[in-house]
Amino acid sequence: MHKRLFLVTITLFFVTIVFVGGALYAIQRRHRAPEPIAVVPDTKVTIIEGLAISEVATSIEKQLGIPKATFEQAVKNFEASEYDFLKSKPAKSSLEGFLFPDTYLFAPTSTSEEIIERMLGGFEVRFAQAQGSLKPNANGVFIISGYENLSINGKRGMTIYELVTLASIIERETGRDVSKGTADSRERLDTERRTVAGIFYNRLGIGQALQSDATINYATGKRVASPSLEDLDVESLYNTYEHAGLTPGPISNPSLSSLEAVLHPIKTNYFYFLHKQPSGEVVYSRNFDEHVRNKNLYLK
């Protein structure tokens, strides 16, 4: 079978530009043999897990040269009404949480809008993967196994926006680099995230504040392991020490692992957790007294 080839020629000064069969050729008029033009390859761009939009913009600037402010403005102005998975997102909220972290190939001429489209497409595919057999009800709400009676803002179940918000908190609470570790270490991190998701669901179920240091860091713009007492008093709806329930929106762009965690949590009787230093491994507690003992044991 012969492939059909399309040929387009453009003559500029002493050179004819020919497009044929998906390749570009420059033919000088005095030469018969075409000379292929050097094709600029796509650029591999890696957006790591758990970055906020401002950090994604910084990464895009470093890897593709698009100014940070330009990308941030494009995100702010992006028309996203056609995406079904964004229907539960408040109209005035940003796309925080939905720019899926992954490794992409972008043409050097890619615009901010094209990059955003690819990342939103990545989220759509990965969220569907995380769902597995779990489907939303007729109202677009997910009823989470083990937490069927959970109500958020007087409504039973979790919307996609609420799930992504919780996943973004879990991402920042449990994220650590296991890229060079074993499959066992990655599996352990996945299990930790599902267990932490269960802890947060336990707290949400009784109206107990999440008390997430990651949300404090988002409110203050810092990246510290232990926020100061002054940080904990920050006036912000993202301060989950002062405000019970979920934050107003996501605090990062979570990984597939964290999306799976909120959709398929591990139900336990734990209500507290902390991170061993320096490994970052999570230690769980059933009550505050156990939590204090673990702090004295692992955080000295």
Model-identified regions with their sequence ranges:
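N-terminal Sec-pathway targeting helices
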Residues: 1-14
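Glycine-rich loop/hinge motif
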Residues: 38-65, 152-158
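Hydrophobic alpha-helical membrane-insertion segments, chiefly the h-region
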Residues: 16-26
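Short, glycine/charge-rich beta-strand/loop segments that flank catalytic centers
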Residues: 49-51, 73-80
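Ser/Thr/Pro/Gly-rich low-complexity linker/stalk segments immediately outside membranes or between
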Residues: 27-40
